[in-house]
A protein has these predicted regions:
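A short beta-strand motif characteristic of beta-propeller blades
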Residues: 2-10, 45-53, 91-102, 139-148, ...
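Beta-rich, blade/repeat-based domains predominating
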Residues: 10-23, 54-67, 101-117, 148-162, ...
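Conserved beta-propeller blade signature
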Residues: 26-30, 70-74, 118-122, 164-167, ...
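Beta-propeller domains
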Residues: 28-50
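Short loop/turn segments immediately following the C-termini of beta-strands
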Residues: 31-33, 76-78, 123-126, 170, ...
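Structural signal for beta-propeller blades
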Residues: 35-37, 79-82, 127-130, 173-175, ...
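Short loop/turn segments that connect beta-strands within beta-propeller blades
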Residues: 40-44, 85-90, 134-138, 179-183, ...
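Blade-level signature of beta-propeller repeat domains, shared across WD40, Kelch, NHL, RCC1
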Residues: 198-226
Length: 226
């Protein structure tokens, strides 16, 4: 792990998840105060899918099917839902699954594309859970409780090269390389990030992108031999 640079974003608050846009134009980001946005590499944000009723969507994690461009996201607080918005319109969301495993404000927090037609979803805490779901009908394929090493599943990234998971833990301010059961293999401190709730591994640029829920900044953290 090397140094880092930051990108300040405009037009996004409650920055809770991040992934690269499939066309390479920037990021798709989750906001816990509205929904899903696109952000350029210079930080300008545009709306992708939001709902403005009440306090808006408590969107905590986001991922993309690179083949179709469909966006999947998870909602916390009252709803505890996995949703999908289909490309290219991104005009309407559909509920893929309802998962009531966590407590208030400690529920669904993370989601990542597995590349085999399935999704990995993380329940934040109490309990820390890894759930594997069908991306077609939302059925649960497997369920794994993490009882050590991770205190808070803040975001997930499935690493197809390693067949492993990267887990962001905002409570301990760490990035963790784990096996598919959530057992920590290696841990990296990101103490310079106040509330790192978004994580995406980018081998093309030899970095890990993280988003800070407190400041709405994006961090580009250099890594060698990813």
């Amino acid at each position: 792990m090397g140094g880092y640079t930051t990108i300040s974003t405009t037009g996004i608050q409650g920055f809770s998840g991040i992934c690269l846009a499939p066309d390479g134009s920037g990021f798709i980001v989750a906001s816990d105060r509205g929904g899903v946005y696109k952000a350029s590499f210079s930080g300008e944000a545009t709306t992708l899918y939001v709902e403005t009723a009440g306090f808006g969507l408590d969107c905590e994690g986001v991922t993309v099917d690179p083949a179709t461009g469909d966006v999947y996201f998870v909602l916390e607080r009252e709803k505890q839902e996995v949703r999908r918005v289909r490309a290219p319109e991104y005009s309407e969301s559909e509920v893929l699954a309802v998962i009531n495993e966590g407590t208030f404000n400690s529920g669904l927090e993370a989601i990542t594309w597995r590349g085999d037609g399935t999704l990995m979803v993380g329940n934040q805490a109490n309990p820390c859970l890894l759930l594997r779901l069908s991306a077609t009908d939302g059925s649960i394929i497997s369920r794994r409780e993490i009882t050590g090493g991770i205190t808070d599943i803040s975001d997930l990234y499935y690493d197809s090269k390693r067949n492993a998971l990267w887990i962001a833990d905002s409570e301990t301010r760490t990035i963790n390389l784990c096996d598919l059961q959530g057992n920590v293999q290696k841990s990296y401190s990101v103490s310079f990030i106040d509330n790192g709730e978004g994580l995406y591994v980018d081998r093309e640029h030899q970095c890990i992108w993280m988003s800070d829920d407190t400041t709405s900044q994006i961090y580009k953290i250099s890594f060698s031999n990813l």
